[in-house]
Amino acid sequence: EDGRGGYAKLASVAKTFKKKTKRNIRSLLIHAGDAYSPSLLSGLDKGKSTVDMLNAVGVDYMVLGNHEWDFGPKITRERVWQSNFTVLASNVVDSEGLPVDGTVRTAMEIVGPFRVGIMGLVTPNVKEVSSPETDQFLPVMDTAKKLAKELKSQGAHLIVAIGHLDFVEDMEIIQSGLVDVLLSGQDHYHIFFDNGKDVWMDAGEDAEKVGVLDVHMKSYMKRGKKRFSWETDMRYVDTKHIKEDTVIASKVKSYEDLLGKELDVKIGETLSELDSRKKTVRTEEAAIGNLIIDAMREGVKAEIGITNGGGIRAKKIYDPGTKISRRDILSELPFGNVVVKLGLTGSQIWEALENGVSQVEQNSGRFPQVSGISFTWNPKAEVGSRVVSVDYKGRPLSKY
């Protein structure tokens, strides 16, 4: 977006730092999850091309994110085994209590005389927002406490958690003091925190800005004992003016050419502006949300329709007169979700809408785009009591 981000620019930034690698300097490229989905191409090949690109870029470590289960646990495992880098999912186990096949619980990096312990933590709400089936997600804090102890017993001087966690879960990790460094994803914020004891960094999304964290470690003698200390420098590399890596750019183009043959087919035209930016579809009624859920409702001949704004993904503004293509449709709706028609009571509809507006402050993807009904809500009210009214066919819909 705006000339920022993408694999080719990420590769250029990564190469700059990896050139500095030697015995006492280790440069690692870390991905905080949500790689396999959603994207235009992953909707067609279930993330295979994404892992191919991550391998080419030179990722060293990745934690699984909630979208890694979008195509089911079998595909999750296929993509993990396809990876040429270490994949962590420290608090995830299968139905038999074993780690997800191909992942590791912890890792240890040796940097000169120092040992850096690494864990990867996944938000437990995967079971609500994706398709993990029988995979289980253990409590984040319990896992962090257990693994921090294990890593220290293995001689770790510094403990790093790569987290694909909600903001509140990130805060709990930092406040606990269990880890020294938290590198997080999921919320897509730019976070830059260092209180002298713990460091927390989040680099947003899509490599628009690449987070760079330099950790300087040293040992010294004090009162006859060997001590260890560390300090950090944090910054972001804005990729807007970064030159693309030519090899990776060529690889990206080959995938884009493949897509173009199938998707650059015009299927319609918009007569009014459509806004699919995240801040719009996740916080308010949006024309594009109305259009999408109207089509879903018409497709199954339902009386009303509700879809979550977080399923609308392209983050674009379509000016009036824009020709709409297959590419646009798949960019906006990459998940391959199924439209379900079912009977609901008035109270169940109210409950669904309450759930939809319960996490607007966190920019959650559950905000309801609706068809066939209208509702008003108060964002300042207590969660669970925010919906003020619901109308169906011009009449109030009973809450009871």
Regions found by a protein language model. Give the residues of each.
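Short acidic (Asp/Glu) and glycine-rich catalytic loops that position anionic groups and cofactors
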Residues: 192, 229-232, 270-276, 328-335
